[in-house]
């Protein structure tokens, strides 16, 4: 057990998505008398450090806590995503649902997955706001701000990436359906995601003036957007999981390419609760899903089975942190670990490769010489485009 931990939590958030995951926990922590702080500095010196990124450096935290910012996080690396996101460098890990709990338990035989104190099944804190009065008020505000007619059904388009003019494909797909189309794009910024920022801006310009089309501010919390909709359309975005948490049917388009590699790849979404279709069937499928209540029933059954802690994650998380601060016994939500065993050769190679990447990142961001080399590399890369 850790000794003499002060009631001070620093949330290390590198973007708005991570911050939205942390905010319910921060509110619960404040309610319990903790001092809280938000920072983008991955190397911040902390009493209690709360981490959600793909790249984490918790060495400067007296007590380090890690969780997921995305229910589909690193899905290309399942079932052992911990070979590239090491949890053994943390004290505590938090799991959002039954499936993640089972996946972690099965991977707990590998050292890279095992935090020093343990892993706990707590729930997904980002979804806690669904049960708040603030949530209802925010949705009313959005309806008023955009002038949305709530008597019409709404389709939400929220992709992980905008590519190949698919926003215009969505507008075309719904134009004869007598529905609203709500558009919620990823909050790309010109400095971090310049290409996506440019593409999204161009799509928004081409969408101006289209009837029954509402382009939401990209910083809008996804749960607010989902609350206004009756069905979600995406490809492999985490919004597909988040829609499920609100009992909203989801449509995953299987031939919308994802440009996170070159050449762009087909999307991956490993869950059966989504209706998976090619883009040519969009209009027909949206119409069918909106008229058939069985889709909602199926989603709700899945949610009830896998997310029993919905709305209580922040309380569960703070109960665990309180146990350490006040030196109390842990709750029964601690997940049992399997006996340790050696990693397969291929997994060892992934771990070694990731460690090298992390070392380079740390060098580039914690020394003046490293920062100079990193900026020079970025400049040369930009010049030779």
Predicted feature descriptions by range:
Residues 7-140:
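Active-site and donor-binding regions of nucleotide-sugar-utilizing enzymes
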Residues 50, 65-66, 92-94, 120, ...:
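Hydrophobic/aromatic beta-strand patches that form the interior of the parallel beta-sheet core
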Residues 283-385:
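C-terminal amphipathic helix plus adjacent low-complexity
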Residues 197-218:
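Nucleotide-activated donor-binding/catalytic signature segment of Leloir-type glycosyltransferases, i.e.
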Residues 62-68, 219-262:
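A donor-sugar binding/catalytic signature common to diverse glycosyltransferases
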Residues 42-43, 83-86, 173, 224-225, ...:
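Structural alpha-helical scaffold elements that stabilize or flank donor/cofactor-binding regions
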Residues 11, 18-28, 122-203, 309-315:
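Conserved catalytic-core segment of nucleotide-activated headgroup transferases in glycan assembly
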Residues 87-90, 109-116, 238-308:
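Catalytic binding pocket for nucleotide-activated donors in carbohydrate/polymer assembly enzymes
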């Amino acid at each position: 057990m850790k000794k003499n931990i002060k009631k001070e939590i620093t949330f290390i958030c590198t973007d708005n998505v991570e911050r939205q995951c942390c905010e319910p926990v921060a509110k619960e922590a404040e309610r319990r008398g903790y001092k809280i702080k938000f920072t983008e500095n991955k190397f911040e010196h902390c009493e209690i450090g709360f981490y959600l990124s793909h790249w984490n450096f918790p060495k400067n935290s007296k007590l380090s806590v890690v969780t997921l910012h995305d229910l589909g996080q690193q899905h290309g690396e399942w079932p052992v995503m911990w070979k590239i996101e090491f949890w053994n460098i943390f004290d505590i890990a938090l799991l959002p649902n039954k499936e993640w709990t089972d996946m972690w338990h099965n991977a707990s035989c590998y050292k890279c997955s095992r935090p020093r104190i343990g892993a706990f099944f707590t729930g997904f804190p980002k979804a806690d706001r669904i049960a708040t009065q603030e949530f209802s008020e925010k949705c009313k505000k959005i309806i008023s701000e955009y002038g949305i007619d709530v008597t019409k059904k709404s389709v939400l388009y929220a992709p992980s990436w905008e590519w190949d003019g698919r926003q215009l494909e969505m507008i075309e797909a719904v134009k004869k359906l007598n529905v609203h189309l709500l558009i919620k794009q990823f909050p790309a910024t010109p400095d971090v995601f310049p290409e996506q920022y440019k593409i999204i801006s161009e799509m928004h310009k081409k969408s101006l003036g289209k009837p029954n089309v509402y382009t939401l501010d990209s910083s809008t919390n996804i749960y607010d957007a989902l609350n206004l909709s009756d069905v979600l359309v995406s490809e492999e975005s985490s919004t597909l999981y988040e829609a499920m948490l609100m009992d909203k049917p989801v449509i995953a388009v299987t031939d919308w390419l994802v440009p996170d590699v070159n050449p762009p790849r087909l999307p991956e979404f490993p869950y059966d609760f989504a209706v998976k279709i090619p883009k040519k069937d969009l209009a027909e499928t949206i119409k069918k899903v909106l008229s058939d209540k069985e889709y909602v029933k199926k989603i709700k059954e899945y949610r009830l089975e896998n997310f029993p802690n919905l709305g209580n994650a922040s309380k569960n998380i703070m109960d665990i942190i309180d146990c350490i601060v006040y030196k109390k016994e842990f709750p029964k939500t601690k997940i049992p670990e399997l006996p340790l065993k050696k990693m397969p050769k291929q997994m060892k190679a992934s771990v070694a490769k990731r460690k090298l990447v992390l070392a380079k990142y740390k060098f580039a961001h914690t020394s003046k010489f490293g920062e100079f080399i990193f900026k020079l590399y970025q400049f040369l890369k930009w010049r030779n485009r």
